[in-house]
């Protein structure tokens, strides 16, 4: 039987993901990513409505961090055999995460790899940041990423870095708001000092 490009035909009681074509699987995975993003958006909205903006944001940040460290990171690392603790391995995870940077047109990133333990990315497009920019929502942008420490993105990256390597460091030389619409939304760098890997003096 040929691979299924869609599921508009008859119901298959013995359906398996392996029955789908590569194109259909990619489309389904990207749809799952959008569903995960939607779950995150609704979760933070409900938390803020019920607990207030600050407490709700803090609660959601903690829920997301625990979900990544308890489920997403270990399960994806196991599924794709990503076992190293260097920065480039974390970027491999970023590419295939439930809200990953390669799927469905949600993000457009450029990567700069100095070595396996020094990697930067430039965010040319971000669906969430673009939404806040379009609606002039400075508070939403700050809570997402623009205020740096305390924002959702900063909290998430702290948790993900720690899950891969407690010695990993990060900096964020560019954050919103953008000077103009042709500028990147953000730029982040992640690295591990060689002395930290070798156990040498700081």
Where are the model-predicted features located?
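N-terminal accessory segment detector
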Residues: 1-120, 125-152, 156-158, 162-185, ...
């Amino acid at each position: 039987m040929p691979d299924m490009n869609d599921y508009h035909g008859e119901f298959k009681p013995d359906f398996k993901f392996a029955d789908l074509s590569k194109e259909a699987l990619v489309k389904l995975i990207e749809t799952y990513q959008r569903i995960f993003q939607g779950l995150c958006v609704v979760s933070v909205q409900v938390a803020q409505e019920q607990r207030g903006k600050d407490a709700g944001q803090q609660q959601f940040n903690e829920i997301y961090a625990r979900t990544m460290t308890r489920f997403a990171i270990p399960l994806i690392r196991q599924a794709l055999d990503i076992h190293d603790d260097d920065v480039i391995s974390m970027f491999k995870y970023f590419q295939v995460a439930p809200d990953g940077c390669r799927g469905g047109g949600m993000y457009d990133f450029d990567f700069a790899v100095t070595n396996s333990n020094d990697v930067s990315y430039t965010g040319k497009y971000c669906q969430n940041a673009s939404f806040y920019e379009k609606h002039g929502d400075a508070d939403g942008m700050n809570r997402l990423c623009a205020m740096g420490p305390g924002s959702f993105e900063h909290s998430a990256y702290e948790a993900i870095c720690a899950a891969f390597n407690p010695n990993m460091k990060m900096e964020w030389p560019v954050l919103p708001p953008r000077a103009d619409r042709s500028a990147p939304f953000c730029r982040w760098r992640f690295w591990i000092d060689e002395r930290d890997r070798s156990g040498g003096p700081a």
